Design a protein with these regions (language model features):
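Active-site phosphate-binding and catalytic loops of NTP-dependent enzymes
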Residues: 79-81, 104-113, 282, 418-424, ...
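C-terminal tails and terminal domains of large nucleic-acid-associated
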Residues: 886-921
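ATPase nucleotide-binding head domains, primarily ABC-like/P-loop NTPase cores
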Residues: 29-30, 261, 331, 342, ...
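Conserved catalytic alpha/beta cores of large enzymes that bind or transform nucleotide phosphates
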Residues: 161, 166-172, 180-183, 541-571, ...
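Intracellular alpha-helical coupling/juxtamembrane segments of multi-pass membrane proteins
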Residues: 353-356, 376, 380, 475-478, ...
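Conserved phosphate-binding elements of NTP-dependent enzyme cores
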Residues: 3-7, 14, 567, 574-577, ...
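Charged catalytic and DNA/RNA-contacting regions of genome-maintenance
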Residues: 1-193, 207-362, 371, 378-391, ...
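Amphipathic heptad-repeat alpha-helical coiled-coil/stalk segments that mediate oligomerization
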Residues: 235-239, 298-304, 310, 314-315, ...
């Protein structure tokens, strides 16, 4: 047995081998050490008496899925080795085979899957300046590919990979340096030969990682998942194309949009091959592949997704305060995944967006229809993943029942949609297949409430199989049959004392006394002679015995055969089931958006092909849900001419960042197909939303907060377009005042003036000097978030109005934060001195300026604006330096005033002078 284990382990290095022994999965040698540690189970040993004990640990087979899930979530690959023959039918070592390898990117068991999130396996490859990537969710069959060419190709593909957030990324070993450059990680190479020679690196975190192990993407700032290098020979273009052609059963890949997309084809083939090898199955449910380009959807990079808190809140304690949580009213897993996809990749096609708006509008208007649809959809299972399990050979009895129950709801759903006017809802209705044949097959063959596992028996309905019914009857009625047979033999032989008995040695036999032995019929076969009795058997008894003793075993075997046959029959209708699943998912998503619109008072936006972005009384969709007071709505107007750069000033905590974020969220909601939180909205179709908000460092890459800020800003300046929306919040605050102001000024000016980069921009800042730009830039406008003072306290009004703010009210915010009164008093004193000194400097500068104007000094409008901003900044800096010097030395002045020279000795005066000298700045 140990030799068998070692042979299988040698065929699957880089995995933890779950070796089936009876009712347990056992791990041996190093695998046992790792398994015991990671699963926190007892580590024991085999052959202790020999002096060379073999470490081992094990888990019960009935709960193994949970243990496997723990290991895979930690980055391990698990090879599942099963007994593939009946131990009772062989005297040799039972045959065992690895039936599946579970990796982070190829899970199909529910314990390893998030019901409301996709689980992607990704692959990336490159030739020259062409880079291809593919994304496969083996649990549902969703398959996508893309390709980029040129100097920026790696950045573009890296952005796609970030967006899809794969659990595992495959790549050629030779690309390790580029992977490191693109994702900030250093993958190591190794080998994991699979069935056809597929080679991946070995797996296992922590110390295992130091020896040819995988590298977790959590070491990178942009991805979380497992990096898996594969041998270069597996990435041959010709072989890859033929693999896909054969799998899809076509003559060419041109129909999938993959013509002349060599790198995309190679990446897609790598994904498919890896999935087939790990699952030991053909993956027939992967029946299509979609080629996409970045311009096919509104681009939201990971920075924007994080900053806008689209799917996850930034604060650990605010995990539920993300946009997706607020708008997700879906009632099926597949609907939830589709809604999430719409949010992360909104459409840029007006027809598609307005079709979703139309569906939401109809469902929004009909409360009864919407509630009835949601009630029916709640009974629909995750048909996408259920179909995946059917095709991968891992479906359970209750999966088929769930499929039947789900399909039973389709006629009702179709009836509800029949009288609607919306084009999209009619298309969905036509896509719904009632699959009456599949429903009938399952209803006639599978019990309504079968056990969880097939081996528990009782899965196949009575009446479906005559042989199975006979076996069950035989098993249930064994005692009655024995009594009837015994009575029959007594009557036939005339021996009243004849008995039919059973023991473990001879099985069933007929026993008669010695006195009656001569009266037995001639067809009786002697089995055993005892002192006072004879034991016989008959052909009929032997036949019945064989049936009874093998009935339970045969029942399970026959049920398994019938169940497998039914699964194969249902799987032949995969295309029809998937089409219905997609339609139900879409219906769930638009119904969810309608429900959200009703609950949150959202309105239908007007989409257009122009450049005007107008939101009237817009609200932040997340903040308004979680605050205890009425949300203050604000209106925003942007275009690409007169209002393309809005410079927003205002107090801390006033709501500048909220206005920025809510504007972007409203645009994203509209383009995903949702209604929006506003009184009204007229919106253009954006190509990308850029954000530079918040403060964060990247110590793993040696990047400071300011470096991260500048890197993100540089990406915006290089890639923004007139169709983009840019949010800039406090650019330049991470460095010295003059440096920061200079950078902020230049960034705003660049976005305004550059014809190819003049995106619609919201620029929030505390550099009030930037408000001077609005006087010379034709497309710049000043806005402020208002506040007022009442009875000595600041009241934040949170209203966005035209104009520039004069104060930041930072000390008031510090008071609200709980700063000690003494510190607040000192801060007010310092501020008063700074402001007084600034006014003095300003008065002197005004006199100089007036003198210069009197002698005819002139300057251009542009120079004047920049000069005023520079003067204001210089005045602030000079005031700070001079006044702070005075404040710091105030203690010295106070001590000198209190000193009385007439009463001091020479030594005391000398000591005081020395102490004061040490205090001078």
């Amino acid at each position: 047995m140990v030799r068998q284990y070692q042979e299988l382990k040698a065929q699957h290095p880089g995995t933890l081998l779950f070796f089936r022994l009876g009712d347990f999965y056992e791990l041996f040698f190093d695998d046992a050490v790792v398994g015991a540690r990671e699963l926190q189970i007892t580590l024991t040993a085999r052959h202790k008496e020999r002096g060379d004990p073999i470490p081992m640990c094990g888990v019960p087979h009935h709960s193994a899925a949970n243990y496997i899930a723990k290991l895979v979530r930690k980055g391990y690959r698990v090879a599942i080795c099963e007994q593939t023959e009946d131990a009772s039918k062989t005297k040799k070592l039972v045959r065992r085979e690895v039936v599946r390898i579970v990796t982070p990117g190829t899970p199909i068991d529910p314990q390893l899957l998030e019901p409301r999130e996709s689980t992607f396996l990704a692959a990336v490859c490159a030739r020259g300046e062409s880079v291809g990537a593919a994304f496969l969710d083996i649990s549902t069959g969703e398959f996508r590919a893309t390709q980029a060419h040129g100097a920026e190709s790696w950045k573009r593909i890296a952005a796609d990979i970030e967006s899809y957030a794969p659990r595992e990324l495959l790549f050629p070993v030779s690309l390790a340096p580029l992977i490191r450059a693109a994702f900030g990680a250093t993958p190591k190479t190794g080998s994991l030969p699979l069935k056809s020679g597929l080679r991946a690196q070995e797996t296992g975190p922590e110390e295992n990682q130091t020896s040819d192990s995988h590298l977790s993407m959590t070491d990178s700032a942009s991805l979380s998942g497992t990096l898996t290098p594969l041998d270069d020979w597996l990435w041959q273009a010709d072989d890859s194309e033929q693999l896909l052609i054969k799998h899809f059963g076509v003559r060419s890949l041109e129909g999938f949009g993959l013509a002349k997309k060599g790198e995309a084809i190679t990446a897609a083939a790598a994904c498919l091959r890896y999935a087939q090898e790990t699952q030991r199955a053909g993956a027939a449910h992967v029946a299509d592949i979609l080629y996409f380009e970045p311009q096919d959807h509104l681009v939201l990079d990971n920075i924007t997704v994080r900053n806008l808190e689209l799917v996850q809140a930034l604060g650990a304690s605010d995990s539920g305060r993300a946009l997706l949580v607020v708008i997700d009213e879906t009632v099926t897993g597949m609907g939830a995944r589709l809604l999430r996809s719409w949010l992360l990749r909104p459409s840029v096609h007006r027809g598609e967006v307005e079709a979703r708006h139309g569906a939401v509008a109809e469902l929004h208007a009909s409360h009864m229809e919407r509630d009835a649809l949601r009630a029916s959809l709640k009974e629909v299972a995750d048909l996408e993943r259920l179909t995946g399990r059917l095709n991968l050979g891992s479906a359970m009895p209750r999966d088929l029942v769930a499929l039947r129950v789900s399909l039973d709801r389709v006629p009702t759903i179709r009836e509800l949609l029949a009288n609607g006017d919306c084009a999209l809802l009619q298309v969905l209705n036509e896509s719904l297949d009632e699959l009456a044949d599949v429903r009938s097959l399952i209803a006639s063959s599978i019990e309504d409430d079968p056990p969880v596992k097939l081996v528990d028996g009782g899965v196949i309905r009575n009446g479906y199989s005559a042989e199975l019914d006979e076996l069950r009857s035989l098993s249930r009625n064994a005692k009655q049959t024995i009594a009837a047979l015994e009575a029959e033999e007594r009557a036939r032989s005339g021996i009243g004392s004849l008995r039919i008995r059973y023991n473990n040695v001879f099985g069933y036999f007929i026993e008669v006394s010695k006195a009656n032995a001569a009266r037995v019929p001639p067809e009786y076969e002697r089995r055993q002679t005892l002192a006072n009795a004879e034991r016989f058997t008959t052909p009929a008894l032997k036949e019945w015995e064989a049936k009874v003793l093998g009935a339970e075993e045969r029942i399970l075997q026959l049920e398994s055969e019938i169940f497998s046959l039914i699964c194969r029959q249902v799987a032949t209708e995969t295309a029809r089931i998937q089409a219905t699943a997609r339609a139900l998912a879409c219906l769930d998503a638009v119904t969810s958006l309608a429900e959200t619109a009703v609950r949150r008072r959202y309105v239908r936006p007007t989409m257009h092909d122009g450049d005007e972005l107008e939101v009237v009384h817009g609200r932040h969709p997340v903040i308004e849900v979680f605050i205890d007071e009425p949300f203050v709505p604000n209106s925003v107007y942007l275009n690409n001419s007169t209002d393309r750069l809005l410079i927003i000033t205002g107090p801390n905590m006033g709501g500048k960042s909220t206005v920025l974020r809510q504007t972007a969220l409203i645009c994203i909601l509209a383009q995903m197909g949702s209604f929006v939180p506003a009184e009204s909205a007229r919106l253009p179709l954006l190509d990308r939303v850029w954000t530079r908000v918040g403060a964060s460092d990247d110590l793993a890459r040696g990047r400071s907060t300011f470096m991260v800020e500048m890197t993100e800003t540089a990406a915006i300046l290089h890639n923004a377009t007139p169709r983009s929306l840019v949010l800039l919040d406090e650019i330049g605050r991470g460095t010295a005042t003059f440096d920061g102001l200079s950078i902020a000024w230049a960034v705003a000016e660049y976005l305004h003036d550059s014809p190819e980069r003049c995106a619609k921009t919201l620029f929030a800042t505390h550099y009030h000097e930037l408000t001077e730009m609005a006087e010379r830039l034709p497309g710049a406008q000043n806005y402020q978030i208002t506040a007022t003072e009442r009875e000595g306290e600041v009241v934040f009004l949170h209203r966005l109005e035209r104009g520039r703010a004069s104060k930041s009210y930072g000390i008031e915010v510090a008071r609200l934060a709980g700063m000690p009164p003494a510190a607040l008093a000192r801060a007010r004193e310092v501020l008063q001195r700074l402001e007084r000194y600034e006014l003095d400097v300003f008065a002197e500068e005004t006199q100089v300026a007036e003198g210069a104007m009197a002698v005819g000094a002139t300057r251009s409008t542009e120079e004047a604006a920049l000069s005023r901003a520079t003067s204001r900044a210089a005045r602030r800096r000079l005031a700070a330096q001079s006044s702070l010097f005075d404040l710091a030395n105030q203690k010295i002045v106070d001590e000198l005033r209190e000193a009385n020279p007439e009463k001091m000795s020479g030594e005391e005066a000398k000591q005081l002078l020395s102490e004061l000298k040490d205090q001078v700045m």
